[in-house]
């Protein structure tokens, strides 16, 4: 692909290092050119493992947002998803934010409003809904196969 997307990662810890960066690297359509983490060593390690030769490293996400990037991945702790995403959208970046979208509906609405105001793409990593087991359960519920559900239990990774 001649014109690869230029992406930045904000938050180079667990989910970014374990899932996002390895997946992005295998796609071949996106170059990771910027890494930000409060722990500089994490960002430097991510650059060495997944970045382009000229990738940049930051501890302040606002400095990363000054770069000419097509998109940023927000992979930070849950409480920071909203304000980092809003800042990124206002900086003219498309955003893929890790789940959960925000810590409350008001923060989520700020994110939606910023995407609408800027005309930028905002996507949230709710990939679990496309898993075969999730799709099967959704289909069964919609078909009324489970009757009146009064209790459900699910397991998920939480921090």
Give the label of every model feature segment:
Residues 23-27, 46-50, 87-91, 110-114, ...:
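Alpha-helical structural signal in soluble globular domains
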Residues 6, 31-32, 68-70, 93-94, ...:
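Structural signature of beta-strand start/N-cap positions in the alpha/beta core
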Residues 11, 99, 144:
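Conserved G/P- and acidic residue-centered "switch" motifs that form tight phosphate/ATP-binding loops
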Residues 1-51:
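N-terminal Rossmann-like dinucleotide-binding module
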Residues 55-110, 114:
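Beta-loop-alpha module in the N-terminal Rossmann-like domain of NAD(P)-dependent dehydrogenases
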Residues 34, 71, 151:
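Short, Asp-centered acidic motifs that coordinate Mg2+ and/or phosphate
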């Amino acid at each position: 692909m001649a014109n690869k997307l230029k992406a930045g990662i904000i938050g180079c810890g667990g989910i970014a290092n374990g899932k996002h960066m390895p997946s992005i690297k295998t796609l071949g359509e996106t170059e990771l050119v910027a890494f930000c983490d409060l722990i500089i060593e994490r960002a430097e390690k991510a650059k060495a493992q997944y970045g382009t030769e000229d990738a940049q490293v930051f501890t302040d996400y606002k400095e990363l947002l000054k770069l000419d990037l097509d998109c940023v991945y927000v992979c930070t702790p849950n409480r920071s998803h909203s304000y980092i995403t809003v800042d990124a959208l206002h900086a003219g970046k498309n955003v893929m934010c890790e789940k959960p979208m925000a810590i409350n509906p008001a923060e989520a609405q700020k994110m939606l409003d910023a995407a609408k105001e800027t005309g930028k793409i905002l996507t949230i990593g709710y990939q679990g809904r496309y898993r075969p087991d999730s799709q099967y359960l959704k289909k069964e519920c919609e078909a009324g196969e489970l009757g009146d559900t009064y209790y459900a239990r699910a397991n998920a990774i939480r921090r």
